Amino acid sequence: MKRSSMDLVYKPISGTIGSVSGTIGSVSSVSGTIGSVSGTIGSVSGTIGSVSGTIGSVSGTIGSV
């Protein structure tokens, strides 16, 4: 029997999206000071490459009463 060109073997596409992890740091206020909000949007790595970023820091002072 002659095999046609349409007779193919399709392998399943499998992969892992890795892990998504991150910490939002800490938010603290002491004597009228809005501390710092810092965190890191961890990394998403897998067969689709990697995406990583950091949300810097936000800090300010309300002064004292």
From Swiss-Prot:
The gene is tigB. It comes from Paramaledivibacter caminithermalis (strain DSM 15212 / CIP 107654 / DViRD3). TIGSVS motif repeats lie at residues 16-21, 23-28, 33-38, 40-45, 47-52, 54-59. This is Precursor peptide TigB. Is subject to maturation by TigE, that catalyzes the formation of methylcyclopropylglycine (mCPG) residues from isoleucine residues residing in the repeating TIGSVS motifs. Precursor peptide which undergoes post-translational modifications by tailoring enzymes, leading to the mature natural product. Keywords: Repeat. The modification Methylcyclopropylglycine is found at residues 17, 24, 34, 41, 48, 55.
